[in-house]
Amino acid sequence: MTPINLMDALAKRLQDLLTDYTAKQPSGTVPVTVYPGYIPVQNNAAEKKSFVYVLVVETDDRAGNDKSIAVVELGFSIYDADGTDGWRSLYNVVEHVRQDLLKFRFVNMKFRLDLEKPIVFKVPENQPFPQWQATLTATYTIGQPEEEGFNYDDFQEVQAYGQYEEYKNH
């Protein structure tokens, strides 16, 4: 249950969720594409795609927890050439995704949305028209492997404490 598994599973789920969303391009209607990880390098600048990327930007492992957390950034870039109301397309897609994350908090029954941390929605002030961009950041629990190699429960019980003098100064 690695961050890559989370990115792949969440990207697939969002791709299924956004099948009805399209962007009107000069060449016709283009679907919104969801990428796990970074978006591919764009070689054709003639038309800009509408896309979402799913990227784990941070993980946190702490002692005493049986779960680790992964901070996931969902990046949105939605094409809409309407200079007056084009921004609404962005907000519509982001809100659709946000509501889905809240309604269905498990991803593949392996990762769970952690609402002890907020879901954060950010829209940059400067937008590269006709692309409208935003990010949504959410925190998910991911599995944490158990430590191997030393049984701390038996450390002082199995042998007399005096045998561990060498550890006192470390």
What function would you assign to each model-found segment?
Residues 1-63, 154-170:
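Small/polar-rich, solvent-exposed N-terminal microdomains that initiate assembly or binding
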Residues 44, 64-66, 124-128:
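Generic marker of residues within folded, mature protein domains
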Residues 48-50, 68-72, 128-136:
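Residues at beta-strand starts and edge strands
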Residues 54-82:
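Active-site-adjacent structural patch at catalytic or cofactor/ligand-binding sites
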Residues 61-64, 79-85, 141-150:
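Short, cysteine-centered beta-strand-loop-beta hairpins and adjacent loop/turn segments enriched
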Residues 66-72, 86-95:
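"Short basic amphipathic alpha-helical interaction patches in structured regions
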Residues 91-149, 170:
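Acidic-leaning, charged glycine-interspersed low-complexity segments
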